[in-house]
Design a protein with these regions (language model features):
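Beta1/beta-strand and adjacent pyrophosphate-binding region of the FAD-binding site
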Residues: 1-14, 34-36
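Extreme N-terminal leader/targeting segments of oxidoreductases
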Residues: 1-6, 25-30, 116-117
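N-terminal FAD cofactor-binding segment of flavoenzymes
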Residues: 17-76, 93-94, 144, 148
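Residue-level detector of conserved, well-ordered beta-strand and adjacent loop positions
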Residues: 72, 81, 179
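Short, solvent-exposed coil/turn segments at beta-strand boundaries
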Residues: 73-75, 90, 121, 183
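Short, basic/glycine-rich phosphate-binding loops at helix/coil junctions
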Residues: 75-79, 185-188
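Short beta-strand to alpha-helix junction loop
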Residues: 79-101, 128-130
Length: 189
């Protein structure tokens, strides 16, 4: 079994972002890194969206950026402009390709499917993996979405519909979220 200076459990957005930052900031010089990830291949499986509050290293992975957004309710339609903090979406496939192509150039970075493949005996391990008991609160957030393409141009691709509450609330809070990537393609959740 091999030993490593750094071990990142999970090769998703957070884990790969950490590995990438270590690599580009020369923190892996003369160090070894193991990334534990169960997936067999990286493919486009997610779209990550966020408010851009500062510069980041993934501008080349951004598939769309918006300065305008709307919130709809039974009381009306509100359009807001936010040029200081645009809303951006990142294509996970571009993100994975960028990071993995950079990390694959470093022979000190290795990928594993299981933590059992790594020797952690006689080691000091800083455990940043959350292991606490979950608080069983009644608050639950769940998103389900699909990317659609329409035969006609029906979306205003300059405006994100951030929250559309014009749907049955069924004693809970429900809303639609529409990210128009073009005039005829959008992610709807």
């Amino acid at each position: 079994m091999k030993e490593f200076d750094y071990i990142i459990i999970g090769g998703g957005c957070a884990g790969l972002s950490l590995a990438y930052e270590l690599e580009i900031n020369n923190k892996l010089k003369e160090k070894t890194l193991a990334i534990i990830e169960t997936r067999d291949e990286y493919k486009r499986d997610k779209t990550w969206s966020f408010w851009k509050v500062s510069d980041h290293n993934f501008e080349d992975c951004v598939i769309k950026s918006w300065n305008n957004f709307t919130i709809n309710s039974s009381e009306g339609f509100h359009e807001l402009i936010n040029k200081s903090f645009p809303y951006q979406s990142i294509n996970s496939e571009k993100f994975y390709k960028k990071i993995n192509s950079k990390l694959n150039l470093n022979p000190s970075v290795s990928y594993f499917k299981s933590l059992n493949e790594i020797n952690s005996e006689n080691s000091l391990i800083f455990n940043s993996v959350f292991e606490g008991k979950l608080n069983k609160s009644k608050l639950w957030q769940h998103f389900q979405g699909i990317e659609i393409e329409t035969p006609n141009d029906i979306f205003d691709d300059e405006i994100v519909n951030l929250m559309d509450f014009n749907c049955d609330q069924k004693n809970d809070v429900h809303f639609f979220y529409t990210l128009p990537f073009s005039k005829n393609t959008a992610l709807i959740e």
